[in-house]
């Protein structure tokens, strides 16, 4: 099991979240620790599974995916599928970026990206509602994203 992260590990993770391509020399200067220590800590964080991968943050507007919507779904238990099976089918739909099984009045929460609201509607009507086990849905289109972390 991973040991508790110290202050330096946490600062290193924050820097890598901002720019995963930051070089070790720059990270060393920012954190005030030797380059060998930065290298060792990154290696350890990867080996312990704390860092799962190094990734990018796309500009979705430039990719013509500037509309973000969140969709709540009620699971239909009479479908013959488990809630997890329904979630896994939903995860295969192009444009669905996140699928969460949640507690409360609703059973699933999705994050969808599309070029516009009409395309979100097509995803909901033509794809999502065709999946067995999907009951009622509520779609909420985001006006603006104030904060989004990777």
Swiss-Prot record:
<dbReference type="Pfam" id="PF01037">
    <property type="entry name" value="AsnC_trans_reg"/>
</dbReference>
<keyword id="KW-0804">Transcription</keyword>
<dbReference type="GO" id="GO:0043565">
    <property type="term" value="F:sequence-specific DNA binding"/>
</dbReference>
<feature type="DNA-binding region" description="H-T-H motif">
    <location>
        <begin position="24"/>
        <end position="43"/>
    </location>
</feature>
<dbReference type="GO" id="GO:0043200">
    <property type="term" value="P:response to amino acid"/>
</dbReference>
<dbReference type="InterPro" id="IPR011008">
    <property type="entry name" value="Dimeric_a/b-barrel"/>
</dbReference>
<keyword id="KW-0805">Transcription regulation</keyword>
<feature type="domain" description="HTH asnC-type">
    <location>
        <begin position="5"/>
        <end position="66"/>
    </location>
</feature>
<dbReference type="InterPro" id="IPR019888">
    <property type="entry name" value="Tscrpt_reg_AsnC-like"/>
</dbReference>
<dbReference type="InterPro" id="IPR036390">
    <property type="entry name" value="WH_DNA-bd_sf"/>
</dbReference>
<dbReference type="Pfam" id="PF13412">
    <property type="entry name" value="HTH_24"/>
</dbReference>
<dbReference type="InterPro" id="IPR011991">
    <property type="entry name" value="ArsR-like_HTH"/>
</dbReference>
<keyword id="KW-0238">DNA-binding</keyword>
<dbReference type="InterPro" id="IPR036388">
    <property type="entry name" value="WH-like_DNA-bd_sf"/>
</dbReference>
<dbReference type="InterPro" id="IPR019887">
    <property type="entry name" value="Tscrpt_reg_AsnC/Lrp_C"/>
</dbReference>
<dbReference type="InterPro" id="IPR000485">
    <property type="entry name" value="AsnC-type_HTH_dom"/>
</dbReference>
<protein>
    <recommendedName>
        <fullName>Uncharacterized HTH-type transcriptional regulator PYRAB16920</fullName>
    </recommendedName>
</protein>
<dbReference type="GO" id="GO:0005829">
    <property type="term" value="C:cytosol"/>
</dbReference>
């Amino acid at each position: 099991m991973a040991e508790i992260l110290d202050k330096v590990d946490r600062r290193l993770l924050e820097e890598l979240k901002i720019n995963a391509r930051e070089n070790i020399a720059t990270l060393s200067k920012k954190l005030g620790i030797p380059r060998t220590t930065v290298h060792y800590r990154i290696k350890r964080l990867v080996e312990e599974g704390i860092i799962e991968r190094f990734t990018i943050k796309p500009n979705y507007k430039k990719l013509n995916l500037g509309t973000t919507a969140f969709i709540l779904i009620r699971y239909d238990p009479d479908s013959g599928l488990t809630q997890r099976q329904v979630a896994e089918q939903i995860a295969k739909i192009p444009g669905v970026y996140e699928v969460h099984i949640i507690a409360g009045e609703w059973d699933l929460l999705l994050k969808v990206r599309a070029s516009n609201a009409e395309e979100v509607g097509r995803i909901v009507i033509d794809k999502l509602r065709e999946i067995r086990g999907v009951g009622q849905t509520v779609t909420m289109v985001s006006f603006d994203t104030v904060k989004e972390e990777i």
